[in-house]
Amino acid sequence: MTKKLFYFVIAAALICSASVFTSCTSDNDDNPATPDLNLSEKIIGKWMVAERDGEPALTNQKTVVTFLSATKGFVSLSRADYDNHRWLNGNECDVKIEGNIVTQICHPQEGVTVTVEMNIKSINEKEMLADRKLTQTIDGKDIVTNVYMQKFVRVTADYSAAILGTWEGHVTSEQDTYGDGLLHRWQYNADGTYVYYVKDGNNWVPYATNTLNEYFVDGNLLCTRWIDNGVENREWWEITIADGKMNWTALRQKEDGTTYTATFEMTKVN
């Protein structure tokens, strides 16, 4: 073989090799492999919704999800919008993980199944991003299907025990239900009930027209509900407790669609 022919053969081989690698790269670009996020380990723990479709989630839209294992979990939420009334304090759910798809199957009440399918896009120690599809089945018929993107943040605090006792405080934001400039008092009991007090002269007395008076704390989410003059009311707060002080904050929406942040500050008195 002459030197000229030898170089021609080598050049042709290199061109063919380049074509092969280019073809492979192109195929991979068209069909990228889904990265293994190791969800069975990384997802374990407590998570709370922080954003919904790229917007900050209102506090009344927040859900706390706890993954105990790759097969079992719990959900806590309070919903009272439209016809969707739910009061779930640690509702047990079955969990299934297949690749980067996490499915939760919950039974909030007899005849009702809620299936939540989460396509996890990313996850680290602090945050998780997922396309979330929720289907509600009532007596075997799919009634509601919602699809949206959600961002979750990991919750490490648990104030369910720290909140027990009596707290007195006042609103610290400009717009709020309790924006009357007065002190307010709540007594949180271990059985999931609470007592709301009002000032009568120099004495604190239970608010007479309130009934039901239930609450739960999951992580740092405080949910309450009560009946006043036959009408059920609910509230949602994110809380912190330290050194005998409790702070509440909530992102809320006004009737015109604008949002504001309500805050409350309390001191433990008993």
Predicted regions and their residues:
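Bacterial Sec-dependent N-terminal signal peptides
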Residues: 2-5, 17-45, 148-157, 263-270
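Sec-dependent N-terminal signal peptides
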Residues: 7-14
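Short beta-strand segments and strand-loop junctions that repeat across beta-rich extracellular domains
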Residues: 39-43, 77-82, 135, 158-163, ...
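Tryptophan-anchored aromatic micro-motifs
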Residues: 39-58, 152, 156-179, 212-214
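Fold-core signature of tandem repeat domains
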Residues: 43, 47, 67, 102-104, ...
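A structural signal for short, hydrophobic beta-strand segments that form beta-sheets
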Residues: 49, 67, 94, 117-122, ...
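N-terminal glycine/threonine-rich, aromatic-flanked beta-hairpin/loop signature
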Residues: 58-103, 107-109, 177-225, 229
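Edge beta-strand at a domain terminus
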Residues: 134-166, 210-215, 250-270
